[in-house]
């Protein structure tokens, strides 16, 4: 079976067919990185010292992400899934799995310190998510390496407050009977968790700024702007950068919020955007204020204060 899978990968890559994003990843794996789909050695593992150095670079971020990772694992851990977080290079820094599944995931290299970059493992959830900077599913025989076709991986990139890719969030399943519908469901939860981590990291990066949610939602994440006391935009999430043409990464040169949100009264434009975001979250949570606050990445008390300031009642209405 492994030979059949490897032969299929090779014939697909060598064909002239343009193909899909998946076949493009297979082609990168073989032609750019020089990988062999029939290769059997396990993924590369970094030394304990190197792992600690990589964790230290993201120490504050990992502390902030821990509650979200714990919550995600509570949701999927009993279904034969592990929860992993990697750095931007695809090296696993943190993992969670049930004791009964731990040996399996360790044998597969889905454990702290292993390198799952696309250049190391070819097409896989973690590496391809990072290479393409998008949420995706790599299901069993979609993997480049034949030995990785036993797993299904659901991944989402995490972008830092500067708009640059900082990490990847992964849920991998060892269940051979996992359905496509359940895989899609988990993928949605992974993407939402990644957005929540991004939101919390962004708010933590601009503690003295007013955080404004844009009037429109985007699939790639929360549209958040950090506005200082002079109504200057000093920060923006990746999604906000796309929405307002602010450049995808790097430091933002402060600019008037009115230049971005319109000149019809900056304060009223900001309030309309913030009010719309709060009402969306409350409606999506069915009036559950705790759930709405979690989605917004703020505390329940903060949510109530903002509702009062913006004239939003307990039922989410003006």
Stretches with model-predicted labels:
Residues 264-270:
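Dynamic helix-loop-helix/coil hinge segments at AAA+ ATPase domain boundaries and subdomain interfaces
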Residues 126, 248, 255-257:
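N-terminal sensory regulatory modules of PAS/LOV and PAS-like folds
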Residues 252-264:
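PAS-family sensory/regulatory domains
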Residues 1-120, 124-145, 150-151, 159-162, ...:
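Intrinsically disordered, low-complexity terminal regulatory regions
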């Amino acid at each position: 079976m492994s030979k059949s899978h490897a032969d299929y990968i090779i014939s697909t890559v060598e064909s002239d067919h343009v193909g899909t994003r998946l076949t493009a990843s297979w082609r990168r794996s073989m032609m750019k990185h020089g990988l062999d789909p029939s290769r059997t050695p396990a993924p590369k593992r970094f030394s304990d010292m190197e792992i600690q150095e990589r964790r230290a670079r993201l120490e504050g971020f990992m502390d902030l992400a821990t509650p979200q990772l714990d919550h995600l694992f509570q949701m999927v851990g009993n279904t034969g899934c592990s929860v992993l977080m990697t750095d931007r290079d695809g090296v696993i820094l943190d993992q969670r799995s049930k004791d009964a599944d731990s040996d399996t995931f360790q044998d597969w290299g889905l454990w702290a310190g292993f390198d799952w970059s696309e250049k190391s493992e070819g097409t896989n959830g973690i590496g391809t998510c990072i290479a393409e900077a998008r949420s995706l599913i790599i299901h069993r025989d979609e993997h480049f390496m034949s030995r990785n076709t036993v797993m299904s991986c659901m991944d989402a990139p995490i972008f830092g407050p500067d708009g640059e890719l900082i990490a990847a969030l992964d849920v991998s399943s060892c269940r051979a009977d996992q359905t496509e519908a359940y895989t899609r469901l988990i993928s949605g939860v992974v993407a939402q968790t990644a957005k929540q981590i991004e939101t919390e990291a962004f708010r933590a990066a601009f503690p003295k700024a007013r955080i404004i949610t844009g009037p429109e939602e985007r699939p790639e994440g929360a549209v958040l702007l950090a506005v200082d006391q002079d109504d200057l935009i000093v920060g923006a999430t990746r999604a906000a950068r796309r929405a307002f043409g602010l450049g995808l990464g790097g430091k933002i040169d402060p600019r008037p919020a009115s230049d971005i949100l319109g000149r019809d009264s900056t304060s009223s434009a900001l309030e309309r955007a913030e009010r719309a975001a709060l009402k969306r979250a409350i409606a999506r949570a069915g009036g559950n204020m705790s759930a709405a606050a979690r989605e917004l990445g703020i505390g329940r008390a903060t949510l109530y204060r903002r509702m009062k300031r913006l004239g939003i009642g307990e039922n989410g209405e003006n």
